[in-house]
Amino acid sequence: MTLVTFIENLTSTVTEIGWSLFILAWAIGWALRGSPIPIFRIKRGGQDLLEDAIIAAFFLAIGSTIFYLISYIASQVS
């Protein structure tokens, strides 16, 4: 296994896990926010999950771009 393939495998694995967690948090957040439970605290918890998921998706997009840039540079150097 070369350094380039290791970086590419690590990048794709981390990115897949990150997007999966984003989708899970997004779904749970909307389920809690839209639930017919009359407890405001639960609905606010869903709203907080949604806000955190959006921020995480932004940083995940930036981070995956940086990872792929590093992978590209490593493949050009090797």
Swiss-Prot record:
The species this protein was found in? Sulfolobus acidocaldarius (strain ATCC 33909 / DSM 639 / JCM 8929 / NBRC 15157 / NCIMB 11770)
Question: Is Cell membrane included in the keywords of this UniProt record?
Answer: yes
Function recorded in the entry = Part of the Ced system, which is involved in DNA import.
Where, subcellularly, is it found? Cell membrane
Q: Which GO terms describe its cellular component?
A: plasma membrane
Reported induction: Up-regulated upon UV stress.
Q: Where are the transmembrane segments?
A: 12-32, 53-73
Quaternary structure, from the entry: Forms a complex composed of CedA, CedA1 and CedA2.
Q: Which UniProt keywords apply?
A: Cell membrane, Membrane, Transmembrane, Transmembrane helix, Transport
> What is this entry's stated membrane topology?
Multi-pass membrane protein
> Does the entry annotate any disulfide bonds, and if so which pairs?
none
Name the InterPro entries for this protein: CedA1_arc
> Please, which domain of life does this record's source organism belong to?
Archaea
Can you name this protein?
DNA import protein CedA1
Q: Which NCBIfam families match?
A: Ced_CedA1
